[in-house]
């Protein structure tokens, strides 16, 4: 880690310097220059039906291909959550017409560069640094999407121009946005290069009818072609103008939800060269700093001799912080942050830490094994049609002892319904989870071999377990 000890970022000299010695957390904002120079501060989800071009749009804006895994490339679908950061610039020459004065680049681009548009002068200046959470668009992966949605400030809803609207998953995703209370939505009518103008207009009417009465009502509809990069600068302009910068809490104790974790050591590495595990996630609040002592809950879960669950939180120290390829001295909420720790790498490999919560020592919430929730069920199963019937299948009521999949933060775990009333339920979780009263959870049930979203709930109270701590 170059320069990690001195508390000053030495990597990427063309970006704004971060110095821990002069850091005053109370003065930071999501648009502070030294923050957005190196990391994203706004999370935007891309949602929509499979193969409508979500990953392509992200690639057109950020230059990053979010599909990272071999099986995803072969099938051309996104399975895990993909993240990509993009910097949005605005030209400081007032004579340049909109939308040409907006531009997007990758996250390692300098904060200012001269214009290359003929007839204009001045520089492109950094105005926003956004992170795109590329959500998988398949039914089975609805859970992953709700997990990703825990850290979304706004959404781009993609609708392909060459198919009728709405496709089944489009409505399912819109329901997920409503659950997550996302208010800021841009609708992108993609693949516009494949259809005639009359078709595009006809579909525009369909989209208007489809979003009426939902959170997306009144959202701007922008026709684009992600492959040909048509109108991408309009999308950039709308991101800057229509999506307000979310209010962030920089002064609380930091908390990060782990979405990915990995072991960065190559096989055959010498013992002295071993590096600690890396956890990737989005910070909900507070600021993480290099050198800070951290705690990870629930930590290592095991059972004692009587078969009772035990949790042993992991204590460690941050040795490095990254946002894509930019190294940081401190990380603020927004975007995917990689946290290099001194945790045993075997605990982190292959996403083993997903669903855990990382934060300042002693400031993390309780660990729950049972939850009492107030819940709401959807009236109909989204996207599932019953045989011979045009309408979607009805959602059956919760029954005692049935097993559901519960999504809390980034954790998906099984839960058995132990008691149920009109709108209250008790759920015994298979895995303990670190969460708080008032948090939202999503409920899915197995329907025809797939997990389908059936509703959501809010935690009222629950049974907590005391974490065990070694005496040494």
Curated annotation (Swiss-Prot):
Region (G3) residue spans: 134-137
Principal location: cytoplasm
Region (Interacts with CDC123): 457-469
Region (G1): 48-55
Protein family membership: Belongs to the TRAFAC class translation factor GTPase superfamily. Classic translation factor GTPase family. EIF2G subfamily.
Binding-site positions, GTP: 51-56, 190-193, 225-227
Region feature (G5): 225-227
Subunit structure: Eukaryotic translation initiation factor 2 eIF2 is a heterotrimeric complex composed of an alpha (EIF2S1), a beta (EIF2S2) and a gamma (EIF2S3) chain. eIF2 is member of the 43S pre-initiation complex (43S PIC). Interacts (via C-terminus) with CDC123; the interaction is direct.
InterPro entries registered for this protein in UniProt: EFTu-like_2 (IPR004161), eIF2G (IPR050543), eIF2g_C (IPR015256), eIF2g_dom_2 (IPR044127), eIF2g_GTP-bd (IPR044128), P-loop_NTPase (IPR027417), T_Tr_GTP-bd_dom (IPR000795), Transl_B-barrel_sf (IPR009000)
SUPFAM superfamilies in the cross-refs: EF-Tu/eEF-1alpha/eIF2-gamma C-terminal domain, P-loop containing nucleoside triphosphate hydrolases, Translation proteins
Gene Ontology MF term list: GTP binding; GTPase activity; methionyl-initiator methionine tRNA binding; translation factor activity, RNA binding; translation initiation factor activity
N-acetylalanine: modified positions: 2
Matching NCBIfam families: PRK04000.1 (NF003077)
Protein name: Eukaryotic translation initiation factor 2 subunit 3
Single biological process term from Gene Ontology: cytoplasmic translational initiation
Subcellular location: Cytoplasm, Cytosol
Domain tr-type G, chain residue ranges per copy: 39-248
Catalysed reactions, semicolon-separated: GTP + H2O = GDP + phosphate + H(+)
Annotated Gene3D superfamilies: P-loop containing nucleotide triphosphate hydrolases, Translation factors
Free-text function comment from the UniProt entry: Member of the eIF2 complex that functions in the early steps of protein synthesis by forming a ternary complex with GTP and initiator tRNA. This complex binds to a 40S ribosomal subunit, followed by mRNA binding to form the 43S pre-initiation complex (43S PIC). Junction of the 60S ribosomal subunit to form the 80S initiation complex is preceded by hydrolysis of the GTP bound to eIF2 and release of an eIF2-GDP binary complex. In order for eIF2 to recycle and catalyze another round of initiation, the GDP bound to eIF2 must exchange with GTP by way of a reaction catalyzed by eIF-2B.
């Amino acid at each position: 880690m170059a320069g990690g000890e001195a508390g000053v970022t030495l990597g990427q000299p063309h970006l704004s310097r971060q110095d821990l010695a002069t850091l005053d957390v109370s003065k930071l904002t999501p648009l502070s220059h030294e923050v957005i120079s190196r990391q994203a501060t706004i999370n935007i989800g891309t949602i929509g039906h499979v193969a409508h071009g979500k990953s392509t749009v992200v690639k057109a804006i950020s230059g990053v291909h979010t599909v990272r895994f071999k099986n995803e490339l072969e099938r051309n679908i996104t399975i895990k959550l993909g993240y990509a950061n993009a910097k949005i610039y605005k030209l400081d020459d007032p004579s340049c017409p909109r939308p040409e004065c907006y531009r997007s680049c990758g996250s390692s681009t300098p904060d200012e560069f001269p214009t290359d548009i003929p007839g204009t002068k001045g520089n492109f200046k950094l105005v926003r640094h956004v992170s795109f959470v590329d959500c998988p668009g398949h039914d089975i992966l609805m859970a992953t999407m709700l997990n990703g949605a825990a850290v979304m400030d706004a959404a781009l809803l993609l609708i392909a121009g060459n198919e009728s609207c709405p496709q089944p998953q489009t409505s399912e995703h819109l329901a997920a946005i409503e659950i997550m209370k996302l208010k800021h939505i841009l609708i992108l009518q993609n693949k516009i290069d494949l259809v005639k103008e009359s078709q595009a207009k006809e579909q525009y009417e369909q989209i208007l009818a489809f979003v009426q009465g939902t959170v997306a009502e009144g959202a701007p509809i922008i026709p684009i072609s992600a492959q040909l990069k048509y109108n991408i600068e309009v999308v950039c302009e709308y991101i800057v103008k229509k999506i307000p910068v979310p209010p962030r809490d920089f002064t609380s104790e930091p908390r990060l939800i782990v979405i990915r974790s990995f072991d960065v050591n190559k096989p055959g590495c010498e013992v002295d060269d071993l590096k600690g595990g890396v956890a990737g996630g989005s910070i909900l609040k507070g600021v993480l700093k290099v050198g800070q002592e951290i705690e990870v809950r629930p930590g290592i879960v095991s059972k004692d001799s009587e078969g009772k669950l035990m949790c042993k939180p992991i204590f460690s120290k941050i040795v490095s912080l990254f946002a894509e390829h930019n190294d940081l001295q401190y990380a603020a909420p927004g975007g995917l942050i990689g946290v290099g720790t001194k945790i045993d790498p075997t605990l982190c490999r292959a996403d083993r830490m997903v669903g855990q919560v990382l934060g300042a020592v002693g400031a993390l919430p309780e660990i729950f094994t049972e939850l009492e929730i107030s819940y709401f069920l959807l009236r109909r199963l989204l996207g599932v049609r019953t045989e011979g019937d045009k309408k979607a299948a009805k959602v059956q009521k919760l029954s005692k002892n049935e097993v559901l999949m519960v999504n809390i933060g980034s954790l998906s775990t099984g839960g058995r319904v132990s008691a149920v009333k009109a709108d209250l339920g008790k759920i015994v979780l298979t895995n303990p989870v670190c969460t708080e009263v008032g948090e939202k959870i999503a409920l899915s049930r197995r329907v025809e071999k797939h997990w389908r979203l059936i509703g959501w709930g809010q935690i009222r109270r629950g049974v907590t377990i005391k974490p065990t701590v070694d005496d040494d």
